[in-house]
A protein has these predicted regions:
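Short, surface-exposed loop and linker segments with low hydrophobicity and enrichment for Pro/Ser/Thr
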Residues: 22, 27-47, 194-199, 272-284, ...
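A short, highly charged nucleic-acid-interacting micro-segment common to nuclease
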Residues: 38, 43, 190-211, 231-234
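Secondary-structure junction/capping motif
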Residues: 76, 144, 179-187, 200, ...
Length: 372
C-alpha cells in the first residue's frame, strides 16, 4: 500500500471504534495525553509521521526520523509529514497544526535517535517525554504501529467532533437571538474589546481591520487582499502589511495596515519607511493599529515624514478607536461588521486563533445579545 492508502485504512479503522482497544493502561494514557495536549500540537504530529514511516517501511526504526542519523533504519519523518500528513489532516479537519512538526525549534536540526534517554528541550516537557516513550513502545514491540496509529486517529476524530458539537451549540444559541434588537455600535465595541483582552489574542487586531473592509468595502470601492498566515514574515510573503487594501478593479496596494500589540516606536516607523521605499508601486498611506497607547512624539514623527516620502501618509491609530469610529460612521452596517468579524475569527486556523478564543467570542456575543 502507498502512504495515502495506509492513512485511509487507518482512518476507516479509527472511525469504526467507539472506545480504545489498547489493553495497556500506561500506553493508553500516554497517547491520550499527547493527542489532547492543546498547548503544543507538535507531539502528535511527530508521532503520526513516525508511525506512518514505520507502516510504510516496516524495517525502519520509528525513533530515527532523520536521514542525518544514517543507516538503513533511518528515514525522513519530515517527508512523510509534509507529503502525506498535511493533506490528510486538512481533508479530515483533524485538530492539529497545519505546518510540519519538524520545523519547530525542538525538532529541527537533530542528528540522533529520538530515544528516551535523550531529552528534547521543549514545553511542556511531559509532552515530549510521552511522545518518545510511545515511539519506544513501538520500537520494542510493546504495541504495533498500526494499533497505535488507529488509537491516535480515534482520539483526534473524537476531539474534532467534540469541538464541532460545542461550536454548533454556541451558533445555535446565537440563531435563537436573531430578529431581536441588534446590538448598538457601542455594545459591539465593548464586545470586541473584551475579546481583544483575552490571552493569545495577537491575531485579532488584524481581523478587526479586515472585517471593516469585508463589511463596507463595496461602499468604499476598496477591498482587502486575502490575509497572509499569522506566522508568515513580510520577507516571505512580499507583503507591505498585515492588511493590504486595493481599489476595486485594481490589484495595486494603496493602503497598508500593520498591527501592534505594543507601543509603536520610531524604529517601527523607520522600518515602514524602508518598506514603502522598496514597494513596487507607490502606496497612499501606511497605518499602524496598536492595542497600546499612542506615544504623541512618535505620532508626530510619523506625520513629519509626509513630504519626505513624497506624499505617503504614515499614522498611528488606536485599535478600539479605529473600531468605534468605523462603527459609528457605518452605523447601518454594524451587524454586517460583527458577522464579518465572527466569520473571520471562526475561519482562522487554530494555530492563529485558538479554539478557546473562538468559543469565548461566541459566548460573549450570546451574552451581549441576550442581555445577560
Amino acid at each position: 500500500m502507498t502512504p495515502d492508502e495506509i492513512l485511509q485504512e487507518m482512518l476507516a479503522r479509527a472511525a469504526a471504534l467507539n472506545e480504545s482497544n489498547i489493553a495497556d493502561a500506561e500506553i493508553r494514557e500516554r497517547v491520550d495525553y499527547v493527542c489532547r495536549c492543546l498547548s503544543n500540537r507538535a507531539g502528535v504530529r511527530l508521532l503520526m509521521a513516525c508511525l506512518l514511516g514505520k507502516l510504510d517501511k516496516p524495517h525502519v526504526d520509528p525513533r530515527k526520523p532523520y536521514t542525518e542519523i544514517g543507516g538503513k533504519q533511518s528515514f525522513s519523518g519530515r517527508a512523510y509529514d509534509e507529503s502525506y500528513l498535511t493533506r490528510f489532516i486538512n481533508e479530515n479537519r483533524l485538530p492539529i497544526n497545519q505546518t510540519t512538526a519538524f520545523l519547530t525549534p525542538t525538532l529541527r536540526n537533530i542528528n540522533h535517535s529520538l530515544t528516551t534517554n535523550r531529552e528534547l528541550v521543549g514545553r511542556p516537557r511531559e509532552l515530549y517525554q510521552k511522545t518518545l516513550e510511545l515511539l519506544e513502545d513501538v520500537a520494542k514491540n510493546r504495541i504495533a504501529a498500526d494499533v497505535l496509529f488507529v488509537e491516535t486517529l480515534r482520539i483526534l476524530l473524537a476531539m474534532r467532533d467534540e469541538k464541532q458539537a460545542r461550536m454548533d451549540s454556541l451558533l445555535s444559541t446565537l440563531k435563537h437571538a436573531e430578529g431581536s434588537l441588534p446590538l448598538s455600535s457601542e455594545a459591539i465595541v465593548t464586545l470586541i474589546a473584551q475579546h481583544l483582552a483575552c490571552k493569545n489574542a495577537s491575531r485579532l487586531p488584524v481581523l478587526v481591520v479586515a472585517a471593516a473592509y469585508e463589511a463596507a468595502g463595496a461602499r468604499l470601492t476598496e477591498r482587502a487582499l486575502p490575509l497572509n498566515a499569522h506566522n508568515a514574515a513580510d520577507l516571505q510573503t512580499g507583503s507591505l502589511g498585515d492588511v493590504e487594501v486595493c481599489l476595486l478593479g485594481d490589484d495595486a496596494v494603496v493602503t497598508a495596515y500593520e498591527m501592534k500589540m505594543k507601543r509603536v516606536t520610531r524604529d517601527d516607523i523607520d522600518s515602514a519607511v524602508i518598506k514603502i521605499a522598496r514597494a513596487p508601486q507607490r502606496i497612499h498611506n501606511y497605518l499602524f493599529v496598536t492595542t497600546d497607547i499612542v506615544d504623541p512624539s512618535v505620532a508626530a514623527y510619523a506625520a513629519s515624514l509626509y513630504e519626505k516620502t513624497d506624499g505617503v501618509e504614515i499614522a498611528i491609530l488606536d485599535c478600539i478607536g479605529f473600531l468605534r469610529h468605523f462603527l459609528h460612521l457605518f452605523h447601518r452596517l454594524r451587524t454586517d461588521y460583527l458577522n464579518a468579524y465572527q466569520r473571520l475569527v471562526l475561519n482562522e486556523p487554530d494555530s492563529a486563533v485558538g479554539q478557546t478564543l473562538k468559543e469565548v467570542f461566541l459566548t460573549l456575543r450570546q451574552a451581549a445579545e441576550s442581555g445577560d
